[in-house]
């Protein structure tokens, strides 16, 4: 792979997809295997949504919670996650992420190497971002939030 220069973008110009139409999570594809030797996405889980249990032969997978609450399951270990939590899953470990909170769960996920995960995402149906997604991803605060009397 030859990387010609800086990879730069904005989430509003990125593809948004699901792996399958029935999935309870969607992906904002920030950077894929054609741009760098890894994939980076914002994974958005609907309330009650989850990934299927899965593992990767070679890839390390890094998760950082941007918003919401959930559970990370790695092997037999299960732990609560919330905004600011992060965890790394080494290759060969079965893992799953579940949204257990009220509202959506937003997770920045990076997988190194890509292991063709970006191809799997790009082969799925298109999805879209709604107002709540745009608010969370842009860092905007809801009306009245962060004000002091």
Task: Give short role names for the model-derived ranges.
Residues 52-54, 72-73, 89, 95-101:
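Short beta-strand His + acidic residue motifs that chelate non-heme Fe in jelly-roll/DSBH
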Residues 42, 88, 103-120:
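A short hydrophobic beta-strand segment most commonly corresponding to one strand
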Residues 58-60, 64-70:
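Glycine- and acidic-residue-biased ligand/ion/polar-headgroup-sensing regions
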Residues 76-91:
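Short acidic-glycine-tyrosine-enriched beta hairpin
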Residues 58-59, 77, 93-94, 103, ...:
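A generic "binding-loop/recognition-motif" signal
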Residues 1-38, 122-149:
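A short, N-terminal "cap"/entry segment at the start of jelly-roll beta-barrel domains
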Residues 25, 41-56:
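Conserved short histidine dyad/triad with adjacent acidic residue
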């Amino acid at each position: 792979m030859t990387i010609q220069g800086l990879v730069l973008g904005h989430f509003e110009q990125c593809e948004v997809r699901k792996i399958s139409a029935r999935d309870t999570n969607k992906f904002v594809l920030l950077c894929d295997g054609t741009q760098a030797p890894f994939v980076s996405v914002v994974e958005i889980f609907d309330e009650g949504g989850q990934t299927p249990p899965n593992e990767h032969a070679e890839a390390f997978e890094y998760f950082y919670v941007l918003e919401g609450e959930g559970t990370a399951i790695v092997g037999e270990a299960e732990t609560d996650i919330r905004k600011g939590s992060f965890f790394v899953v080494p290759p060969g470990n079965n893992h799953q992420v579940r949204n257990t909170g009220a509202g959506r769960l937003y997770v920045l996920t990076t997988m190194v190497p890509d292991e063709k995960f970006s191809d799997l995402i790009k082969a799925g149906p298109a999805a879209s971002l709604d107002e709540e997604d745009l608010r969370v991803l842009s860092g905007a605060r809801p009306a009245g939030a962060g004000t002091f009397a």
